[in-house]
Swiss-Prot record:
Example of a GO biological process term: assembly of large subunit precursor of preribosome
Annotated protein name in UniProt: Dual-action ribosomal maturation protein DarP
Primary site of residence: cytoplasm
Pfam family, one: DarP
Annotated NCBIfam families: PRK05255.1-1
Primary gene name: darP
Organism: Yersinia pseudotuberculosis serotype O:1b (strain IP 31758)
Length: 182
């Protein structure tokens, strides 16, 4: 058996290809993960309502496939979502993903605003007139008299165990103020 010298690779000519011509190898599992991510994106698109879909930049074929998937149930729906994932692989999904993220973010902002308004309303009812300056500081357009009367009525309703009509009116009023401010 012939033994090769340790420096036998030194005689092999180096590959002089530029880095630009280099082929990037992608593993099979990475391709599968990407395909699964696109299928999940397709599922999210199918779960959206009609109004939300109008805000997302989709071509006619993809929109038709999504609308069809919304009508189908069970196994046919799964196959249709697979098709949508395949269609997404052939498209630039970045604008679609960006629009979807904006929709989700808008929803999250709205939810956090509602929680903030609910906390403010609860504070108004618990503290009464002492909390009104805080509301006026946040919303300078607020009517002090209307706010005070709503708070008093809500406190009376709460004490008498009546339905919380003024309680809801305070929230509606605060929501109107928040919308005007935006």
């Amino acid at each position: 058996m012939n033994k090769q010298p340790e420096d036998w690779l030194d005689d092999v000519p180096e590959n002089k290809n530029d880095d630009d011509d280099e082929i990037i190898w992608v593993s099979k599992s990475e391709i599968k993960r990407d395909a699964e991510a696109l299928k999940d994106l397709g599922t999210e698109l199918v779960d959206l309502g009609k109004n939300a879909l109008e805000r997302i930049p989709l071509d006619e074929d993809l929109l038709a496939a999504i609308e069809l998937a919304q009508k189908i149930k069970k196994e046919g729906r799964r196959r249709q979502i697979q098709l949508i994932g395949k269609m997404l692989r052939a498209r630039d999904v970045e604008p679609i993903q960006t629009a979807l993220d904006k929709l989700k973010n808008r929803h999250n902002q709205q939810v956090s605003l509602f929680h903030k308004l609910e906390t403010l309303r609860d504070r108004l009812i618990a503290e009464g007139d002492d909390a009104i300056p805080t509301v006026l500081e946040l919303y300078p357009d607020a009517d002090r008299q209307q706010l005070r009367s709503l708070v008093r009525n809500a406190q009376k309703e709460q004490a008498a165990n009546k339905p919380p009509k003024s309680f809801r009116q305070i929230f509606s009023y605060l929501r109107e103020l928040a919308e005007k401010q935006q």
